[in-house]
Swiss-Prot record:
Entry similarity comment: Belongs to the activator 1 small subunits family. RfcS subfamily.
Pfam families the record matches: AAA (PF00004), Rep_fac_C (PF08542)
Name of the protein described by the UniProt record: Replication factor C small subunit
Species: Natronomonas pharaonis (strain ATCC 35678 / DSM 2160 / CIP 103997 / JCM 8858 / NBRC 14720 / NCIMB 2260 / Gabara)
Gene behind the chain: rfcS
Function per UniProt: Part of the RFC clamp loader complex which loads the PCNA sliding clamp onto DNA.
GO cellular component, one term: DNA replication factor C complex
Database matches in HAMAP family: RfcS
Keyword ATP-binding: yes
Length: 325
């Protein structure tokens, strides 16, 4: 990497620098983008609901729609709000209504993009539904959420619903290599594999991880990636679980302590990695089901506010105890 790039591309954020500008540029969701392009071509854009995990292209798709519909005027006709930052009924009543009432450039409608709409309260969603009805002649709403089940049915019934799945490994791999080549970064194959694993289908996380590792200077390899992303290596997760299932709780607990304290991995992230690793173990189906149940119980309790370390230790203890008989 050149000296001028040593601070990560002149401090430019790569997720913005390499954000797809058109629907055709979006990778991994071709069936969705084709339907969206048909709506635009027919000048028949409905209200839209994009559901799916973070970093899979929901915001990018909404922005690309605005750019294709309005061209250079897209900023004046596109309002983006983040419901998790601006919760409550006032968002719906004030900002959305004032934008929906205005017009710019003689277009048939404007677009309001409400990100993380599942963070809105039930009252706010009900108000949003009424606003959607009131301004349906000149405004199109695009809502994004992680979980469509958190969106009230009256809103879902007014939208065309698109479900964005996590991106495939090949799509993330390809994009990471393109960015590394463009930025002049020396990126090893095991570094790519580590970024793909750490991202788990989240392109934003993969690109952020690449930039963070590149800022450190030198070659971006798996060691740099796992360190900068605070991700456990797959073999470390396997070793910890194998030790527990072999009845060596002390060794498994020591490995857990290393991951939590020395490496600095959050308990919730360890749970996610455990869940991803279940089928990599040589387990009978009954054993795999039991392990999945224990992971689910620990995840539920951690989400409810219980101690991450205590719940993970209890999970390992249950595995060790279950294999003593």
């Amino acid at each position: 990497m050149s000296e001028g790039d040593a601070d990560g591309g002149g401090r430019e954020i790569w997720i913005e620098k390499y954000r797809p500008q058109t629907l055709d540029d979006i990778v991994g969701h071709e069936s969705i983008t084709e339907r969206l392009k048909q709506y635009i071509a027919q000048n028949d854009l409905p209200h839209l609901l994009f559901a799916g995990p973070a970093g899979v292209g929901k915001t990018t798709a909404a922005t690309a729609i605005a750019k294709e519909v309005y061209g250079d005027d897209w900023r004046e006709n596109f309002l983006e709000l983040n419901a998790s930052d601006q919760r409550g009924i006032d968002v719906v009543r004030d900002r959305i209504k004032s934008f929906a009432r205005a017009s710019f450039g003689g277009y048939d409608h404007r677009i309001i993009f409400l990100d993380e709409a599942d963070a809105l309260t039930s009252d706010a969603q009900s108000a949003l539904r009424r606003t959607m009805e009131q301004f349906s002649d000149n405004t199109r709403f695009i809502l994004s959420c992680n979980y469509s089940s958190q969106i009230i049915d009256p809103i879902q019934s007014r939208c065309a619903v698109f479900r964005f799945s996590p991106l495939g490994d090949a799509a993330v791999d390809e994009q990471i290599r393109i960015i590394a080549d463009t930025e002049g970064i020396e990126l090893t194959d095991d570094g790519v594999d580590a970024l793909v694993y750490a991202a788990d289908g989240d392109m934003r996380k993969a690109i952020n991880g690449l930039q963070a590792a590149a800022v450190m200077g030198g070659t971006v390899d798996e060691e740099a990636v796992y360190t900068i992303t605070s991700t456990a290596r797959p073999e470390e997760i396997r070793e910890m679980v194998t030790e527990a299932m072999d009845g060596d709780f002390t060794a498994a607990r020591s490995q857990l302590e290393t991951l939590l304290t020395d490496v600095g991995i959050a308990g919730g992230d360890i749970i996610d990695q455990l869940h991803r690793s279940v089928w990599e173990f040589d387990l009978e189906e009954r054993e795999a089901v039991q392990l999945m149940e224990r992971i689910g119980e620990a995840d539920y309790r951690i989400t409810a506010g219980a101690s991450e370390q205590l719940q993970l230790e209890a999970l390992l203890a249950a595995l060790a105890r279950g294999n003593e008989t």
